[in-house]
């Protein structure tokens, strides 16, 4: 069992029950999935860029990403329908907790001039979105072997009904919020 999964069961659940007064353990919000999405617009000109992005994402997530394709042709962006434009990974259960552990304890502290993540990036339904500007903050990526700095979106989907519940859940996992 992942370290954060055990931590959730033994520490976070009792803390949230006390804070919000839930009657059942099943009412306590939990993290359903973490989705990593990397848009690779440069892949239109050079197909190797997509291969590098997929390889980086696979190292970070520990799981093979799905290549996302364009839904329709857009002449201004020089893309046609079904062109590869990005890649994404959905993490659940053990791998999700392992990734969250690495994100909070290793990756985020390695961000340059890091002062915490925004507490305003909740969507109103208890889900949290954040962006990362460069993939080199993850220890799995070797700085010498990357071809370009690429960012990614990280979406944390929870069962929380409100943003306050989701914020309390992520704060219990020692998520570094600014405000």
From Swiss-Prot:
Entries under SUPFAM superfamilies matching the protein: RL5-like (SSF55282)
GO cellular component labels: ribonucleoprotein complex; ribosome
GO molecular function, one term: structural constituent of ribosome
Coiled coil: none
Keywords attached to this entry: Ribonucleoprotein, Ribosomal protein, RNA-binding, rRNA-binding, tRNA-binding
GO term, biological process aspect, one: translation
Entry-linked Pfam families: Ribosomal_L5, Ribosomal_L5_C
UniProt xrefs under PROSITE patterns: RIBOSOMAL_L5 (PS00358)
Alphabetized InterPro entries for the sequence: Ribosomal_uL5 (IPR002132), Ribosomal_uL5_bac-type (IPR020930), Ribosomal_uL5_C (IPR031309), Ribosomal_uL5_CS (IPR020929), Ribosomal_uL5_dom_sf (IPR022803), Ribosomal_uL5_N (IPR031310)
Superkingdom of this protein's organism: Bacteria
Tagged with keyword rRNA-binding: yes
Protein family membership: Belongs to the universal ribosomal protein uL5 family.
NCBIfam families given in the database record: PRK00010.1
Assembly and oligomerization: Part of the 50S ribosomal subunit; part of the 5S rRNA/L5/L18/L25 subcomplex. Contacts the 5S rRNA and the P site tRNA. Forms a bridge to the 30S subunit in the 70S ribosome.
Primary role: This is one of the proteins that bind and probably mediate the attachment of the 5S RNA into the large ribosomal subunit, where it forms part of the central protuberance. In the 70S ribosome it contacts protein S13 of the 30S subunit (bridge B1b), connecting the 2 subunits; this bridge is implicated in subunit movement. Contacts the P site tRNA; the 5S rRNA and some of its associated proteins might help stabilize positioning of ribosome-bound tRNAs.
Name the record gives this protein: Large ribosomal subunit protein uL5
Protein source organism: Thiobacillus denitrificans (strain ATCC 25259 / T1)
Gene field: rplE
């Amino acid at each position: 069992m992942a370290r954060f999964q055990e931590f959730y069961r033994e520490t976070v659940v009792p803390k949230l029950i006390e804070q919000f007064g839930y009657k059942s353990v099943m009412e306590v919000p939990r993290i359903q999935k973490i989705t990593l999405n990397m848009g690779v617009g440069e892949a239109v000109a050079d197909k190797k860029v997509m291969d590098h992005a997929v390889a980086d994402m696979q190292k970070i997530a520990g799981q093979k990403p799905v290549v996302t394709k364009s839904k329709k042709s857009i002449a201004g962006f020089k893309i046609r329908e079904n062109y590869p434009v990005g890649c994404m990974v959905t993490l659940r259960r053990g791998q999700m907790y392992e990734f969250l552990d690495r994100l909070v304890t290793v990756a985020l502290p390695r961000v340059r001039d890091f002062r915490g993540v925004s507490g305003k990036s909740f969507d109103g339904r208890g889900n949290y979105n954040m962006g990362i500007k460069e993939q080199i903050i993850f220890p799995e990526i070797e700085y010498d072997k990357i071809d370009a700095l690429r960012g990614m979106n990280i979406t944390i989907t929870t069962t929380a009904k409100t943003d306050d519940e989701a914020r309390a859940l992520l704060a219990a996992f020692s998520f570094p919020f600014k405000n």
